[in-house]
């Protein structure tokens, strides 16, 4: 019996507590949103299989607690992660400032060359914005990683962001059969044309 997928990629979401990591995962895996999630205790993961470049990719997306007291738990889960998504809240400047600390944590604990992605979540709350888009774009350029503004609540750019990271991992692992290795700006998930008014990819 043939496998139901061609590749299995482990992804990890990290960032401060309250930035919306769990909501992003639920939106991506189940296309659902619930604003009343309690703060994640320990680690949980969701699975979704997507089609990218003609390949069936099984994405195992791990949620982590942002609180420092759980750091010993999350450190172990960096190992084996092929992609890491750094999440901050556009309405919380401190969560953006702490991205540098999370970058350092990746460097100390993750595999060398792991694919990274920066997400500014809650872009539906424009009136409460504390982190300007240009600030995040600059940080992403400095670290040579992709950047999206997302909204788990409005489903803005969520599929696009996960698909982008999965595609980059596929390219790096040689899963693509033809074409160049330049990072494409388009994504491979078949999704409806969701709202993209204020939260465009960088």
UniProtKB/Swiss-Prot annotation:
Residues 178-190 have a biased composition (Polar residues). A lipid is attached at residue 199 (S-geranylgeranyl cysteine). The modification Phosphoserine is found at residue 178. It is a lipid-anchor. Keywords: Cell junction, Cell membrane, Cell projection, Cytoplasmic vesicle, Endosome, Golgi apparatus, GTP-binding, Hydrolase, Isopeptide bond, Lipoprotein, Magnesium, Membrane, Metal-binding, Methylation, Nucleotide-binding, Phosphoprotein, Prenylation, Protein transport, Tight junction, Transport, Ubl conjugation. Its main location: membrane. There is a cross-link at residues 46, 58 (Glycyl lysine isopeptide (Lys-Gly) (interchain with G-Cter in ubiquitin)). Transmembrane segments: none annotated. Mg(2+) binds at residues 22, 40, 63. GTP binds at residues 17-18, 20-23, 40, 66, 121-122, 124, 152-153. GO terms for biological process: bicellular tight junction assembly; cellular response to insulin stimulus; cortical actin cytoskeleton organization; endocytic recycling; endosomal transport; endothelial cell chemotaxis; establishment of Sertoli cell barrier; Golgi to plasma membrane transport. A motif (Switch 2) lies at residues 63-80. GO terms for molecular function: GTP binding; GTPase activity. SUPFAM superfamilies: P-loop containing nucleoside triphosphate hydrolases. It holds the Pfam family Ras. InterPro entries: P-loop_NTPase, Small_GTP-bd, Small_GTPase, Small_GTPase_Rab. It comes from the Eukaryota. GO terms for cellular component: bicellular tight junction; cell-cell junction; cytoplasmic vesicle; cytoplasmic vesicle membrane; cytosol; endocytic vesicle; extrinsic component of plasma membrane; Golgi apparatus. CDD domains: Rab8_Rab10_Rab13_like (cd01867). The small GTPases Rab are key regulators of intracellular membrane trafficking, from the formation of transport vesicles to their fusion with membranes. Rabs cycle between an inactive GDP-bound form and an active GTP-bound form that is able to recruit to membranes different sets of downstream effectors directly responsible for vesicle formation, movement, tethering and fusion. RAB13 is involved in endocytic recycling and regulates the transport to the plasma membrane of transmembrane proteins like the tight junction protein OCLN/occludin. Interacts (GTP-bound form) with MICALL2; competes with RAB8A and is involved in tight junctions assembly. Interacts (GTP-bound form) with MICALL1. Interacts (GTP-bound form) with MICAL1, MICAL3, MICALCL, EHBP1 and EHBP1L1; ternary complexes of RAB8A, RAB13 and either MICAL1 or EHBP1L1 are possible. Interacts with PRKACA; downstream effector of RAB13 involved in tight junction assembly. Interacts with GRB2; may recruit RAB13 to the leading edge of migrating endothelial cells where it can activate RHOA. Interacts (isoprenylated form) with PDE6D; dissociates RAB13 from membranes. Switch 1, switch 2 and the interswitch regions are characteristic of Rab GTPases and mediate the interactions with Rab downstream effectors. The switch regions undergo conformational changes upon nucleotide binding which drive interaction with specific sets of effector proteins, with most effectors only binding to GTP-bound Rab. This is Ras-related protein Rab-13. It comes from Mus musculus.
